[in-house]
Amino acid sequence: MIIYATEVETINSFVRLESLNEVYGLVWIFVPIFSLVLGIITGVLVIVWLERQISAGIQQRIGPEYAGPLGILQALADGTKLLFKEDLRPSRGNTPLFSIGPSIAVISILLSYSVIPFSNHLVLADLNIGIFLWIAISSIAPIGLLMSGYGSNNKYSFLGGLRAAAQSISYEIPLTLCVLSISLLSNSLSTVDIVEAQSKYGFWGWNLWRQPIGFIIFLISSLAECERLPFDLPEAEEELIAGYQTEYSGIKFGLFYVASYLNLLISALFVTILYLGGWNISIPYISILEVFKRNPVFGTTIGIFITLAKTYLVLVISIATRWTLPRLRMDQLLNLGWKFLLPISLGNLLLTTSFQLLSL
């Protein structure tokens, strides 16, 4: 069999083309992921700076001002300091559980960002069960906290881990029932479909007006899931020193703070998507879809800006709540979840189902 030079060149060019396609495929996989992670890190740094400035304003003090202009680099300086601190481990603790606990908490929350639509179809994974994927993944984080508390071999850490697990279970159910009500109104579990269902009717089509009870329950439950005041029982300083974080130092201690702010940001994003219309601007006579059709790049940028503006508005409310309400006792926390929020959210789901059946 004789192979001519032209055939050899054709085969070589085909092999090179296949190799280039594989390289481009890998690039298109990693570039969106890298961009999302970079955006998340920036968002967390902004939240830390915003919380410190709002807290300083409420307490009538100055706040951070030396690290960068207006103290904007203070969070970066604190993270660098924790990075170089010694990583201490309890001598009689369970080292594998102690080491892997913070990583599980952070990774489980990071995976939830894959179903967040920041603009019109600007989402890493547009899944048909996107909203349920978030609920399933977010329920893994308390397991990491419980592992950290148990692996520390410290009574305060163990009690903090148990409190975190009990609190998560108590408020996960009302939150899930509120999400079910939203999915019934939108006839979908996709986060993109939920936003588009709200855009059909403009400002008054937001689920905030169609589900006001669900919005309040979802907001309270998300604050409890984030362990923010008045729901910070797992790390109550007066009772448990620092809860499940007591024995941690260095970068592992910093990972818990990162997980806390990541959880706060993801909760605010889901409030925006489920109840505040997502990327829709909802101004009369101005349709964001028309902007997308005329200039997709400009429309996508505007959509991201609108989503983040609504998200940070929700974050300001969460931060202000921290310095407004006192901490609940553990029995009050569980009673609120099981005796009030759960029955009300179940009744809200039944009412939503009834209205949807009557409208058929």
From Swiss-Prot:
Assigned keywords, A-Z: Chloroplast, Membrane, NAD, NADP, Plastid, Plastoquinone, Quinone, Thylakoid, Translocase, Transmembrane, Transmembrane helix
InterPro entries: NADH_UbQ_OxRdtase_su1/FPO, NADH_UbQ_OxRdtase_su1_CS
Catalysis performed (reactions): a plastoquinone + NADH + (n+1) H(+)(in) = a plastoquinol + NAD(+) + n H(+)(out); a plastoquinone + NADPH + (n+1) H(+)(in) = a plastoquinol + NADP(+) + n H(+)(out)
EC number: 7.1.1.-
Top EC category: translocase
Membrane topology: Multi-pass membrane protein
Top-level taxon: Eukaryota
Biological process annotations from GO: aerobic respiration; photosynthesis, light reaction
One Pfam family hit: NADHdh
Role played: NDH shuttles electrons from NAD(P)H:plastoquinone, via FMN and iron-sulfur (Fe-S) centers, to quinones in the photosynthetic chain and possibly in a chloroplast respiratory chain. The immediate electron acceptor for the enzyme in this species is believed to be plastoquinone. Couples the redox reaction to proton translocation, and thus conserves the redox energy in a proton gradient.
Record note on quaternary structure: NDH is composed of at least 16 different subunits, 5 of which are encoded in the nucleus.
Entries under PANTHER family matching the protein: NADH DEHYDROGENASE SUBUNIT 1, NADH-UBIQUINONE OXIDOREDUCTASE CHAIN 1
Family assignment from sequence similarity: Belongs to the complex I subunit 1 family.
Name recorded for this polypeptide: NAD(P)H-quinone oxidoreductase subunit 1, chloroplastic
Provenance organism: Draba nemorosa (Woodland whitlowgrass)
Higher taxonomy: Eukaryota, Viridiplantae, Streptophyta, Embryophyta, Tracheophyta
